[in-house]
Amino acid sequence: MTEERATVRPVTLSRLVEVTHVCEEGTKSTDEVKAALDVSHRRARETILEAERISLLSERGNEEESVYATTDVGESFLESVRAEDWPQVSSILATHSPHYKAFIETLENDGQGDLDALLERLEVAQEFTPYSFNQTGIEVVGDWTERLGRVQRNAFSGSYYLKDRSEVPPNFHFVLLEAYDDFEQTAGVDLRQRYLSIPRLREEVCERLGCSREDFDDALLALCQQNVGKLELSGAPLDSAAKDAALGIKKMERSNEGGLVTTSQSTQQVMSGVELYDKQYYYLAVYDSDITFNTEAS
């Protein structure tokens, strides 16, 4: 095996799935991986070596030519991908990838942070280990965590945070009102905008609570229906700035193209509002902050 590299290689999650699948049915040389993935020799080597570091592949063969085979860990990895069990895929990476584990741990220990803040924390945390991070490394591992749903990234501020709630808490409405007030204050006295962007509120509240965007939408709709006359949803023109995000929302799903188990990845640049009775709403207005929230009805 080649001498261990300190930083994570720039390999996408879909490539890790592909190379593990390619080597599943028998050992493969670098040239065979190169042909199967339709990539350059350099890219094939990067992918193989990172998959080997994570224990998805093992090196075999002699000094003349190394070949690679999928390990038991790799088999479990593929089984979880086929089942679209993304939490289990995340668990496997957290166990076997030192960079993935370190990324998650710094968010668990120190809370959310943008790229620069995480880089500073990780440099300190990894000082006495064989591993290190640079900006590219954080973007690579951050991409893995986002696509697996373990981490979300505020699409406006770029802050990473753990998605560690399975449902919104009973104080959802208080956190929403706090975020609403904060945005109202930063909008400026002259603007006096009663209607605030739902996509921006969603990103802020999800970061504060560590909840999923889908759970936010469900809770917001329930809250509005439970407090008619106090909260109001409003639509917006198609070119509304309320829908424009600085960053996309990354997702993953399994696909079977040409018999190869891989992942399709989409980055949603335009963020959706919330939908009620087949209509999209992009703004929220608060007329009375004396509201209640029944989680059982959400």
Q: What does each model-identified segment do?
A:
Residues 183-187, 227-230:
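Short secondary-structure junctions and interdomain/linker hinges
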Residues 190:
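Short, conserved, surface-exposed binding loops centered on an aromatic residue
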Residues 1-185, 193-200, 205-209, 213:
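Donor-sugar nucleotide-binding helix/loop cap in glycosyltransferases
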